[in-house]
């Protein structure tokens, strides 16, 4: 696929009508107003001049075999901004369906991220650096040591965030549980209920009787308590090692969860307690929490249901980090997760994922400051989520 001008023109010869039967179709030649295509003496169509293509996609729209692809040879932000193909296609979709675009994953596009931050190394004027080959580094993190009878001790300062059963398959959920067990960290049910094997898999056992540990050193399962209350019961809340109250998430702050009906199989419907094939929509807030005092009562209620044995966490979306973290800490939780705009999701309106929230790196400093102002930064743990891709990103988040 030659690239000469601003746009790349490619024709799939396997489906092109003209390529299969020369002379039978020349729609692209007829509709292109810029002379990009030509037809030779044998009736075969060729791309004649890449330089004249302006990216209008008229040829692609009229091609009866859908064989033509027009893609920018450079970023659309340089060639067509602000009227990118994505913007135009979204307008078409809304006009045809009356609905918004719904998609998974997270925010796409250039946002402030960890790549824009560098680490200042230790040298003479600061604490001496450590020799990574010869000196040990304490990495354990304990959550709930002052409030829960059974605090959790993460072997490393990382964990698997909440991803619901339904957004992920059963196999994926159990793989995360085994991964948590092998590394001594925690995984999270998400708001879709618990897979039956998930609690003992996360603890490192292959059987519910927990006779012999298979995956050492064993990890933890965090049970998520969300606005939808999918599959919630006293047994559910006590099935794991900690409970997380979900207030929001990075990819769709201000909105509740959404599991598409196409993903609601018989097994998932049974766990969530909903009909097969129906969309699972969580409210955007807790209807039984109308004030800060109600939030404190919810934390106290969950401590009571778990017999004061398990740590209580709270997950926040990217809104007002300082004030939100301060309120969460004052509500009495043991750890606070704050999920930046780069966080992922199984399904969300594209307009919300792209345009609502603040970057993860902008959430961390005010969240830390809120805990310090309350004198709780050594007691309440802060968990940063959203777009952390590797060890360097995690290190930068810890350093902030």
For each of these PLM feature ranges, what is it?
Residues 44-47, 192, 196-201, 252-256, ...:
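Glycine-rich, proline-tolerant flexible connector loops at the mouths of alpha/beta enzymes
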Residues 13, 19-28, 56-59, 376-377:
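Cysteine-cluster motifs in flexible loop/terminal segments that predominantly coordinate metals
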Residues 231, 239, 244, 249-285, ...:
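Hydrophobic, small-residue-rich alpha-helical packing segments that form membrane-like cores
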Residues 1-3, 65-158, 162-254, 260-261:
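Conserved, well-structured core domains of diverse proteins
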Residues 2-15, 34-36, 42-45:
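N-terminal cysteine/histidine-rich coordination modules
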Residues 23-46, 58-76:
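Iron-sulfur cluster-binding cysteine motifs and their immediate structural context
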Residues 61, 283-400:
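Glycine-rich phosphate/ribose-binding loops and adjacent secondary-structure elements
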């Amino acid at each position: 696929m030659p690239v000469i001008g601003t746009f790349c023109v490619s024709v799939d010869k396997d489906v092109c009508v003209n390529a299969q039967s020369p002379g039978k179709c020349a729609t692209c030649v007829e509709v292109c107003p810029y002379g990009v295509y030509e037809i030779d003496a044998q009736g075969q169509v060729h791309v004649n001049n890449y330089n004249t293509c302006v990216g209008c996609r008229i040829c692609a729209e009229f091609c009866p075999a859908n064989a033509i692809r027009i893609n920018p040879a450079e970023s659309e932000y340089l060639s067509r901004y602000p009227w990118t193909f994505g913007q135009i296609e979204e307008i078409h979709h809304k006009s045809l369906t009356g609905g918004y675009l719904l998609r998974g994953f997270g925010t796409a596009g250039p946002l402030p991220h960890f790549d824009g931050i560098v680490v200042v190394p230790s040298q003479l004027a600061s604490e001496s650096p450590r020799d990574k080959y010869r000196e040990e580094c304490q990495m354990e993190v304990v959550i709930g040591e002052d409030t829960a009878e059974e605090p959790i001790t993460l072997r490393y300062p990382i964990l698997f965030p909440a991803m619901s059963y339904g957004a992920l398959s059963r196999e994926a959920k159990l793989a995360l549980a085994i991964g948590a067990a092998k590394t001594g960290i925690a995984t999270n049910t998400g708001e879709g209920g618990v897979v039956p094997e998930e609690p003992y898999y996360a603890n490192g056992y292959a059987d519910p009787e927990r006779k012999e540990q298979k995956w050492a050193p064993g990890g933890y399962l965090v049970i998520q308590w969300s606005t939808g209350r999918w599959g919630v019961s006293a047994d559910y809340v006590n099935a794991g090692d900690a409970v997380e109250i979900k207030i929001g998430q990075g990819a769709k702050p201000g909105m509740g969860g959404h599991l598409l009906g196409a993903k609601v199989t018989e097994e998932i419907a049974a766990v969530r307690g909903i009909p097969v094939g129906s969309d699972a929509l969580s409210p955007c807030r807790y209807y039984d929490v109308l004030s800060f005092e109600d939030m404190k009562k919810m934390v106290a209620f969950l401590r009571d249901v778990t017999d004061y044995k398990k740590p209580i966490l709270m997950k926040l979306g990217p809104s007002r980090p300082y004030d939100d973290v301060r309120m969460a800490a004052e509500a009495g939780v043991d750890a606070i997760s704050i999920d930046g705009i780069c966080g992922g999701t199984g399904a969300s309106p594209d307009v919300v994922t792209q345009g609502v929230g603040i970057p993860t790196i902008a959430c961390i400093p005010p969240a830390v400051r809120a805990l310090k102002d309350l004198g709780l930064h050594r007691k309440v743990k802060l968990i940063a989520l959203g777009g952390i891709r590797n060890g360097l990103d995690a290190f930068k988040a810890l350093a902030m």
